[in-house]
Swiss-Prot record:
This is tRNA/tmRNA (uracil-C(5))-methyltransferase. Pfam families: tRNA_U5-meth_tr. Belongs to the class I-like SAM-binding methyltransferase superfamily. RNA M5U methyltransferase family. TrmA subfamily. GO terms for biological process: tRNA methylation. Keywords: Methyltransferase, S-adenosyl-L-methionine, Transferase, tRNA processing. The keyword Transferase applies. It comes from Neisseria meningitidis serogroup B (strain ATCC BAA-335 / MC58). The gene is trmA.
Length: 362
């Protein structure tokens, strides 16, 4: 058993133990490549003895020379990131403006190799820095953003455009710097395909909470008459709207509401001008299914009451502990029909999972 298989087996065993006592079918398992799977990576820039290099630090330890790990390569990151790393550091080392007080760097790449690089500084960025960064951008064929306290300088664009293949169709996604995107594109495609398979035959309308940039919304829209998706982040809503238009999808509407706010709107406790302004009338929808991909804290108690009202629940989770806690409640009204482990984060303790629940016939 190699290192990758061994760590994946550990995750399978953990899920079986955690969900013991719940009626859960055999876990479907979706593997990751064992290297070059992360589309995002971030490093400190370490300056020592006239040299400059990428660095990380031992987990749980204060950032210092004693805990520092030099990273000339990073196998977890995409091949595009690994190709760029030495070129970027070498080019920046030749420019006093780029090198001085350069503190950290963030890479955001795509499967096609498009690259956005955010250079973070402990100094004010001026016209000389911009001129040097423009030259760097042109030399390396990348997009550069400069950040410092109170400053964000976008030289060309602050996003990349990812293309993910789901079944027989390609979907284009604008991924904006600083906003959440799934880091493992290969596994993300498997997650999208799994979600679409679970949605087959459910029909009617779909409600999605926590939709982000529309990652799941776009491919799932093919299986429903109408889709209403909610998201609180303005940046993510903007990206989702662009993604809907770019993919020429006509049956999705986005509401900029938190899950808690939508619950209040759905139950009639509050009216929201944002819904009215968006031309959204909840009475126009006949929801058969709800899709949720909540943050690590899971679904709050009031939203869970809302979720339990739907016939079908597709639940993607980045925290199996809160998924288990939520399922303890949902199991009173629903049965788990499918369960999947997605190895989004190889060689870490993090586990991404998905379940399909259907309302019990009492």
């Amino acid at each position: 058993m190699n290192d990758y298989t061994q760590q994946l087996q550990g995750k399978k065993d953990y899920l079986k133990t955690l969900f013991a006592g719940l009626d859960v079918p055999e876990w479907e398992v979706y593997e990751s490549p064992d290297k070059h799977y992360r589309m995002r990576a971030e490093f400190r820039i370490w300056h020592e003895g006239g040299e400059m290099f990428y660095a990380m630090f031992e987990k749980g330890q204060k950032a210092s020379g004693a805990s520092m790990i030099r990273c000339d390569r990073f196998e977890a990151a995409s091949e595009a990131v690994n190709r760029l790393m030495p070129e970027l550091i070498a080019a920046a080392a030749q420019s006093p403006e780029l090198k001085k007080r350069w503190y950290a760097v963030e890479f955001l790449s795509t499967l096609s190799g498009e690259m956005l690089v955010t250079m973070i500084y402990h100094k004010r960025l001026d016209a000389e820095w911009m001129q040097a960064a423009q030259a760097l951008q042109q030399q390396l064929d990348i997009s550069v953003i400069g950040r410092s306290r109170g400053q964000k300088i976008v030289l060309k664009q602050d996003y990349v455009t990812e293309t993910l293949k789901v079944g027989n169709r390609d979907f284009r996604y604008r991924q904006i710097e600083g906003s959440f995107t799934q880091p493992n594109a290969a596994v993300c495609q498997k997650m999208l395909e799994w979600a679409c398979r679970t949605a087959e035959g459910l029909g009617s309308d779909l409600l999605e909470l926590y939709c982000g940039n529309g990652n799941f919304t776009l491919p799932l829209s093919r299986y429903f008459r109408q889709v209403l998706a909610t998201e609180i982040s303005k940046t993510s809503v903007s990206a989702a709207q662009w993604n809907i238009e770019a993919n020429r999808i006509g049956n999705i509407k986005i509401a900029r509401l938190s899950a808690e706010e939508f619950t209040e709107a759905y139950t009639g406790k509050r009216e929201f001008k944002r819904l009215k302004d968006g031309g959204i009338a909840l009475t126009d929808y006949a929801f058969s299914t709800i899709f949720v991909d909540p943050p690590r804290a899971g679904i709050d108690e009031e939203t869970l009451k809302l979720v339990s009202q739907f016939d079908n629940i597709i639940y993607i989770s980045c925290n199996p502990e809160t998924l288990r806690a939520n399922l303890d409640t949902l199991a009173e009204t629903h049965a788990v029909e499918r369960a999947a482990l997605f190895d989004q984060f190889p060689f870490t303790h993090h586990i991404e999972s998905g379940v399909l629940l259907k309302k019990k016939i009492l």
